[in-house]
Amino acid sequence: FVDPSTLATLPRRQYINGLAESVKASLLADPELFAIFEKGDIDEQIGEIIYRSLRFKKSIVEQDETEHGMRKALNFGHTIGHGIEAVKGVKGRRTVGLYHGECVALGMLPMIESKALQKRVRAVYRRLGLPLRTAYNKDKVYAEMLHDKKAQGGQITVIKVPGLGCWRAETIPVEGLRPLLGMED
């Protein structure tokens, strides 16, 4: 049982921060959920958003308990997101910065291959109040990304979204992360 009314106790920024994972689910597998983010009343439809997001995650985890197959999709946005979070995230004594969901939201954008879909996602972020960009030291973020659990032997598996509702895991050299951060070769 999930009681959406408890969300009213959260500051608005935390509420929106949590929605980033639901936006992720919509991009990976649920175009109808994405439509809610584009045009729906988020607060009125929060029960549906929660239901659809949990249904997606439950389905993935039940099919792949060990993260060797489709469960990898849940890492979408997290490779870059965790790098940003390590450098700019709210943690420990650092009380100013970005929350986890905000970092993941930023990490999803470069992994969306369709420019048209990127534009739509940016519009959703604006609508929700998620960040579209943030200033950060790219070298530090890149260095943090090299410590990602998916980085092994100079390779890293990233999740890319070529279009709404579809994704693929792609193993690339870790140097391939640099252009995703907008770094020069």
Give the residues covered by each predicted segment.
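Active-site segments that bind and position negatively charged phosphate/pyrophosphate groups
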Residues: E32-K140
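A glycine/threonine-rich phosphate-anchoring loop and its flanking beta-alpha core
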Residues: F1-G40, P162-G163
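Short, function-defining helix-loop hinge/capping sites that tune catalysis or transport
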Residues: P11, A86, E170-T171
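Glycine-rich, charged/polar anion/phosphate-binding loops
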Residues: L7, S59, M145
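Glycine-rich, flexible loop/turn motifs
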Residues: T6, F56, M70, K160, ...
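C-terminal charged capping/lid subdomain of soluble metabolic enzymes
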Residues: A20-V23, L117-D185
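Single-residue recognition of alpha-helix boundary sites
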Residues: Q14, K88-G89, V174-G176
